[in-house]
Amino acid sequence: EAQLGNFKFANGSIYDRLGKSKCRLYQHKSGPLSGKIPQVAAIKNVNFGDVRPLAGFEADLAKSYPFGYTFIEPAYGNILNNSYRAKIYNAIRNSSLWDQSLLVITFDEHGGFYDHVPPPAAIPPGDAFNPKHNKHGFDFSTYGVRVPAVVVSPWIKAGTIDHTLYDHSSVPAALTRLFGKEPLTKRLRDAGIGEGL
């Protein structure tokens, strides 16, 4: 059972579901633990020592790379992010793994811009909902504002634009389906994963 602060993920995390040996975590920062991805401390069987500096990503790809899923926490700010995105893309593109790769670039915020499209209804996750950890009573039955995503792969036709509704649960949903695992929540079970791309 994974936990973040006092909130417990009754169904575990995507790392529990896939298994630690299939996942690799990178972050642009290296050094003291305080600079590491804070949520790592909440993921069962994953710790700060499992987060590797992004500087070693390209060299790791050149070796035998056994990981089916790689999560990269980027730098913050547009200039740094653009540089890191290019570096990550080029590392994957120039590796022997390119022909079997899918690079998904997501954003966790919409940038503060007005969105004329109201958020539609969403399938609530269906996992444990404890009002004690949700003082505003949000039940996750509505999506938030739209955020962009970029999907890059030799398997996707260049210039493809997809208007299908996806959400942040589409990534772990795709992973569970790809690796033949049970979804963590109802939302993951029903999330779009881009099969038509």
Residue spans of the language-model regions?
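N-terminal pro-sequences and low-complexity stem/linker regions of secreted or lumenal proteins
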Residues: 1-197
